[in-house]
């Protein structure tokens, strides 16, 4: 049974900007307290890496990950990124560097911001080992901030139309629904941290939103 729990990171409901998860690992800002780290470990059931990127706490905005690889900003000084042998690691050199906000991926595909260069798209594709396309989701270019994707399901912002939902379902090979978190925020990627084993949502997320999130990601 997938566990879903309300929480905060550094007193913020927008937990997705401070953390990123996949099925075997999760990353969280080094500034998170021990109680928060333990909660993430318990719910997500994975090893938790406490890291900083160039001294920033905004880990979730700067990491894209699937089973094959990790994408990080070029030239970044990363503290705590160890024990991830077996994955491809790309330090992406492009005018877009908030890669966590601008890439959404699982082990079947990746969607990236339209402004990524052809070279960047190919490097991301090679690193994550999946077909990679440039497009928006629900008219939002920062696809990672406005959607949540696991190996089981995908939640996207409410502006996503039926044709897009069907395309995303076929492309990522998971169930897809639209919804909000944190009392109406369309930026669900900034509000949720999830993998196939557990779901953490921002503390302002309503019971109706939780039911929707649980339905698609569980």
Swiss-Prot record:
Domain of life of the native organism: Archaea
GO biological process: cytosolic ribosome assembly
Pfam families for the chain: eIF-6
Classification via InterPro entries: eIF6
Repeat in keyword set: no
Keywords, alphabetical: Initiation factor, Protein biosynthesis
GO MF: ribosome binding; translation initiation factor activity
Family indicated by similarity: Belongs to the eIF-6 family.
HAMAP family membership: eIF_6 (MF_00032)
Name the record gives this protein: Translation initiation factor 6
Organism expressing this protein natively: Thermoplasma volcanium (strain ATCC 51530 / DSM 4299 / JCM 9571 / NBRC 15438 / GSS1)
């Amino acid at each position: 049974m997938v566990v879903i729990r309300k929480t905060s990171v550094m007193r913020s409901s927008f937990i997705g900007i401070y953390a990123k998860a996949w099925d075997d690992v999760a990353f969280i800002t080094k500034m998170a307290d021990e109680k928060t780290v333990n909660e993430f470990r318990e719910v997500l059931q994975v090893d938790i890496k406490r890291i900083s990127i160039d001294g920033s706490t905004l880990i979730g905005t700067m990491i894209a990950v699937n089973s094959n690889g990790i994408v990080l900003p070029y030239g970044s000084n990363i503290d705590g990124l160890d024990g991830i042998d077996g994955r491809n690691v790309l330090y992406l050199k492009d005018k877009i560097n908030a890669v966590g906000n601008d890439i959404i991926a699982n082990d079947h595909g990746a969607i990236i911001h339209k402004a990524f260069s052809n070279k960047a798209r190919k490097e991301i594709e090679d690193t994550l080992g999946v077909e990679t396309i440039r497009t928006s989701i629900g008219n939002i270019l920062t696809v990672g901030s406005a959607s949540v994707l696991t190996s089981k399901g995908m939640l996207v912002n409410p502006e996503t139309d039926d044709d897009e939902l069907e395309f995303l379902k076929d492309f990522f090979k998971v169930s897809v629904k639209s919804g909000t978190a944190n009392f109406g925020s369309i930026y669900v990627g900034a509000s949720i941290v999830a993998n196939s084993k557990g779901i953490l949502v921002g503390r302002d997320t309503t019971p109706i939103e939780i039911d929707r999130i649980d339905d698609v990601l569980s």
